[in-house]
Regions:
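Short helix-initiation/N-cap motifs at beta->coil->alpha
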Residues: 248, 308-316, 334, 495-505
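Short, well-ordered beta-strand elements
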Residues: 57-66, 120-125, 150-153, 207-209, ...
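Aromatic- and charge-enriched surface segment that lines or borders ligand/interaction sites
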Residues: 110-170, 208, 317-320, 381-383, ...
Length: 620
């Protein structure tokens, strides 16, 4: 899941980013739904009186450090949009709130799926009595969540018009998925009414998903909001563009208001049945034990309203928390000294106010990508590879961590975060910071300096390296660090500013030369390494990297169990990334999150988004 690099820095991410367990969620569709699954036909349907215990007077105020793009779960791929859709839709499975290592558990499913002996067919039973938010598309009837809704959602990913960022995952994993998509491309229309061989309904509450081969990571895909059950009649009512602003699900919250790039307000879904807080904390963890003791036995959710502000500047974010305008904050790096002592303990001024701290190494990776299709830095010829490698060697990551991250990060040696399954603590990158070596490499490949000390291309044309970044103060700091680094090796730097959603769009079109991003919420190495898989160009492969050897190793990685052979394949992938100069790795964040005293049970799970159902807040 793509996250703006400056955002990862501003708030050390408003939610977690990647981790050593599992990651993702998918599912949904088939057949004409119409109103066939509605129950009582009242002009104004009466929600279940025993449903959602949330108190409308309990208002949680939070902030995102970057703008959202929209709320169609099949089409969005940024952290903040997904955080909202995760609170609106229900996938079949999710993660246990406190289990470490992480454990997948049923959500909208009645139980964990039945898996065939050959490991290729997953059969799910949907819980009875789950209902969508009341909506005019249901024509006055209560609309129950059924198996067909999950089939429909999955098939929406196969529909080419939706341009799903997850399509490569499903192509690889689900039987017949790629063929259905290719058929739709050829015909110009996806047939949602034809029975799909790999995703199909067995009865009203039962669906089956057939895989191409046994897959260790398939269930983790289904934990994501993009696999939550969607009602076909809602999708068809709104159409392609309007659906982004009108998500309808069976999850705990409803989108009440959206002012693009400014404000998002959610209110409790009256149809959501709720649950009792009953989770087992990790042993010997005082913070988690305290939270469990505080929350055990409460009827959840309790938060009846969530108000999200978009605050892109770190200073404004910090002032909002200090002034109790927001209830929780991931401390921006530039304000870490105002929150923590030199030993990383909470400052006494905050302790005296009853503020709680939750601190963790994040499941994320931050990197600078280099577009292989860019006319200046792209390409696979020796001189272009030398240029990218020199740029990477010329950038001082240690200084970035010290100056911009304020020491709250771990230098990345590989693409997989230390807290993600597949990380190898013994692996060390070949790439080292060395302006001397970078200059020598550029000299060797014909990038000559002019009288002012700036280099030209080997053909004599001016060399100008262009990076994209946001308008935030943190990105301005980073721009200065890039300028300093490039001046050391004689490369002119041009910085282009734009908004995060627009840069995501351009990145998918291979139109950005270079940009700093973060990748988050991957549960396993496979989901990180696909960032350079050629089949994800136009989705998550912003470097637009195509390499047959990389692809072959990635295909092998997906099939291998844990062990020395799989580790060797991961090493091959890392080396191919380094040798070709595709990514300049930066760091994994150490996040410090603070919550005011009135917030009870606050913590962060590495993989769960839209997690407001798990904690409580005192009324004003």
């Amino acid at each position: 899941m793509a996250v703006e690099f400056s955002t990862r820095l501003d708030l050390l991410d408003q939610w977690g980013m990647l981790l050593k367990l599992k990651f993702k969620k998918h599912l949904s569709f088939l057949g004409l739904v119409g109103l066939c699954c509605a129950q009582l036909a009242f002009a104004n349907p009466v929600p279940n009186p025993k449903a959602n215990p949330a108190d409308p007077d309990k208002v949680l105020k939070i902030a995102f450090p970057s703008t959202e793009t929209g709320f169609d779960p099949v089409r969005v791929n940024d952290l903040y949009s997904n955080t909202i859709t995760a609170a609106i839709l229900q996938p079949l499975v999710t993660y246990d709130w406190m289990a470490m290592p992480t454990r997948i558990v049923p959500h909208a499913a009645e139980a964990m799926p039945e898996v065939s002996a050959d490991g290729r067919t997953y059969t799910f039973k949907v819980k009875k009595g789950l209902f969508f938010t009341p909506h005019e598309a249901f024509k006055g009837q209560r609309r129950e969540l059924i198996a067909q809704d999950f089939v429909y959602t999955l098939l929406r990913h196969a529909d080419p018009k939706n341009r799903s960022p997850q399509v490569s995952d499903f192509d690889d994993k689900i039987f017949g998925f790629a063929d259905a998509r290719k058929k739709a491309v050829a015909s110009g229309k996806f047939d949602y009414d034809q029975r799909h061989p790999g995703i199909y309904v067995i009865d009203r509450y039962t669906l089956a998903i057939q895989l191409n081969q046994p897959d260790r990571n398939f269930l983790s895909l289904l934990t994501n909001p993009f696999a939550g059950g969607m009602a076909r009649e809602v999708v068809e009512k709104y159409g392609f563009e309007e659906l982004m602003a009108n998500p309808v699900g069976s999850g705990p919250y409803i989108l009440e208001k959206w002012v693009r790039g400014s404000k998002i307000i959610l209110k409790a879904n009256p149809e959501y049945p709720g649950f009792v807080w009953d989770f087992e904390p990790p042993a010997n963890n005082p913070v988690e034990l305290r939270i469990a003791s505080q929350m055990q036995g409460r009827k959840m959710p309790q938060v009846g309203r969530v108000e999200v502000s978009i605050i892109e500047e770190p200073q404004s974010m910090w002032l909002a928390f200090s002034g109790k305008e927001i209830d929780v904050v991931a401390v921006p790096p530039s304000f870490i000294e105002k929150a923590l002592t030199p030993k990383n303990d909470l400052q006494q001024t905050w302790v005296a106010q009853g503020v709680n701290m939750y601190r963790s190494v994040e499941p994320d990776i931050r990197y600078q990508f280099f577009n292989m299709k860019d006319p200046v830095i792209g390409g696979y010829t020796p001189e272009k590879i030398a240029l990218r490698r020199a740029i990477i060697m010329g950038f001082d990551v240690d200084e970035e961590i010290r100056v911009i991250r304020k020491g709250q990060a771990v230098k990345a040696q590989q693409m997989v975060s230390p807290v993600i399954a597949g990380h190898d603590p013994n692996y060390k990158s070949l790439v080292k910071f060395s302006p001397l070596s970078a200059n020598a490499l550029l000299d060797e490949f014909g990038y000559k300096k002019d009288a002012k000390g700036y280099r030209s291309m080997p053909d004599g044309k001016p060399l100008v390296f262009t990076i994209y970044s946001s308008t935030s103060s943190i990105d301005r700091e980073r721009d200065e660090l890039w300028k300093k680094s490039m001046d050391r090796i004689g490369i002119r730097l041009k910085v282009k500013k734009d908004k995060f959603p627009e840069m995501l769009k351009q990145g998918k079109q291979c139109a950005i030369p270079s940009w700093a991003l973060g990748w988050t919420r991957s549960s396993e190495a496979e989901f990180v390494m696909k960032l350079l898989y050629s089949k994800t160009i136009g989705q998550n492969n912003y470097a637009c990297f195509e390499n047959a050897e990389y692809d072959a190793n990635f295909e092998k990685l997906k099939r291998l169990p844990d062990g020395p052979e799989r580790t060797k394949v991961l090493h091959n992938l890392y080396r191919l990334m380094e040798v070709n100069g595709v990514l300049g790795l930066s760091s994994t964040g150490i996040a410090t999150r603070l919550s005011h005293q009135r917030v009870e049970g606050y913590r962060k799970h590495p993989l769960i988004l839209g997690d407001w159902i798990y904690y409580d807040i005192q009324k004003p």
